[in-house]
Amino acid sequence: MAVYDVGDLDLAKKYGIVDVDADDRITDFVEKPEQPPTMLCATATYLYTREDAARVETYLAEGNPPDQPGNFVAWLHTRAPMYAYRFPGEWYDIGDAAQLLEADNRMRRRRGLPERAEYSPS
């Protein structure tokens, strides 16, 4: 799982948060915790083994929710080793139109392009 240190415990409350051991093995995963144990945010970037992917059927057969990939991760890390990869540099949450517009305008400024007033992919 790719993670990013958001650097702020209040901001961490908005995300799925992971805790890791000294080898970056995931020891805990909590979705939008009231009191985050760390500032390592799950970025919804996952790499699964074939064995992990095969566990999806078991996960669903147990009546777990089929949406939100974080639910599967929270379940899986207690059954199989999962590790965190810490993204260096910048990461942008583009979960809604306003966040996407902000990230897009930041990139546009870097390239000397005019900012957009609203997001339109064209």
Where are these regions (language model features)?
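Catalytic-core segments of class I nucleotidyltransferases/pyrophosphorylases
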Residues: 10, 22-121
